[in-house]
Amino acid sequence: MSQLKYLITFSILLRFGFFFFGLYQDEYMPVKYTDIDYLVFNDASKFVYQGLSPYLRETYRYTPILAILLIPDNFGKYWYHFGKLLFMVSDVITGLIILKLLSKQQQLSEKKKMILSSIWLLNPMVITISTRGSAESVLTVMIMLSLYYLLDKDNVILSAIWLGLSIHFKIYPIIYLPSILYYLSSQETPFLASVPGINLVNAKNLKYIIITLTTLAVVNYLMFLKYGWEFIDNSYLYHVTRLDHRHNFSVYNMVLYYKSALLEDSNGFDIEKIAFVPQLLLSAVIIPLIFAKEDLISSLFIQTFVFVAFNKVITSQYFIWFLIFLPHFLSKTKLLTTDKITGISCLLLWIISQATWLYFAYKLEFLGENTFDNGLMYSSVFFFLSNCWCTMKFIQSL
């Protein structure tokens, strides 16, 4: 147990090291460490602190709750980085919950638990994202609390409340609801065992969906009362028709780029409005039906990996969404035991396909070379196909 304490202590110190280096870089280097999103969060929180709407800050496309959480940023000079510290704490708590859920697997040694939890706790990408001021860790801690109360405490009510809050915070965790409901269908006798479809319904999952949707509805209603339609438009509707072609790994990147250049009154095909169809069909329907009953967290990992791969906008922050489930998945998969070559191949292909895209993005952004058609388009397709191949191997490895 002392080794685990050392791991946690070191992970905290590592985050503070990144944080203080970030302060130095912001002060003395031309390329800033702090994420531009943090400046947006901070400005939005300033408006809330003044009793105004966070949506007065242009490009703030998030729930008002995030701006409310960051109100202390405005208490004075030394409070400016309060939000980063909040994200770092959420980051560590996420890691602790990952460790707690791994501890439920009696067959895992302490050493293996440490190694697997280190994938999150000592991951430089995870640490960089939270210490730069990205709010993803607030979302991950909500999702992991939902799983903690469901799988460790068997508390359906608290689990459903946390899931409802996470869906409010960002829409995508709603894809986890079918998996959880399907998982819970195996926990109790269904109401009508002989009726197809209805035979999945029992008291537990019925309670879960009611509490989840009620929590979501109540929080959304409160935010709507305060901020009106601008809350709905910016937090939800904007993301359905979003055209974001910059810093975007997605296979839809080039389509969105050319679409954004068209006149607003053009009659072009609105691919951004239907891109979610194959994405949701795979991540919210097919994968849960195959895996959720057998291994809930592994199902969530594959769902999220596919959801990100098929998303019309992909940035490095989105990788955090499936990394929270990776330690558990690796504890169950053959990719670390009898099929290590495939596991290494997946890792290398995922990294190389990203690096290829980043190379052409660097040439475009910093060297001013036109790499859209010859570089970024092909590297986006390469990244997408690499993710598809990895998904196939993930499924085969369980």
Swiss-Prot record:
Uppermost EC category: transferase
Q: Where are the transmembrane segments?
A: 4-24, 79-99, 114-136, 156-176, 209-229, 271-291, 305-325, 341-361, 375-395
Q: Which gene encodes it?
A: GPI14
Write down the species.
Candida albicans (strain SC5314 / ATCC MYA-2876)
For this protein, what is the EC number?
2.4.1.-
Report the subcellular localization: Endoplasmic reticulum membrane
Its protein name is: GPI mannosyltransferase 1
Record-level Gene Ontology MF annotations? alpha-1,4-mannosyltransferase activity; glycolipid mannosyltransferase activity; mannosyltransferase activity
Protein's UniProt keywords contain NAD: no
Sorted alphabetically, which keywords does the UniProt record give? Cell wall biogenesis/degradation, Endoplasmic reticulum, Glycosyltransferase, GPI-anchor biosynthesis, Membrane, Transferase, Transmembrane, Transmembrane helix
Q: Pathway it acts in?
A: Glycolipid biosynthesis; glycosylphosphatidylinositol-anchor biosynthesis
Q: Which Pfam families match?
A: Mannosyl_trans (PF05007)
What InterPro entries does the entry give? PIG-M (IPR007704)
What does the UniProt record say this protein does? Mannosyltransferase involved in glycosylphosphatidylinositol-anchor biosynthesis. Transfers the first alpha-1,4-mannose to GlcN-acyl-PI during GPI precursor assembly. Required for cell wall integrity.
Q: State the family it belongs to.
A: Belongs to the PIGM family.
Tell me which domain of life the UniProt entry assigns to the organism this sequence originates from: Eukaryota
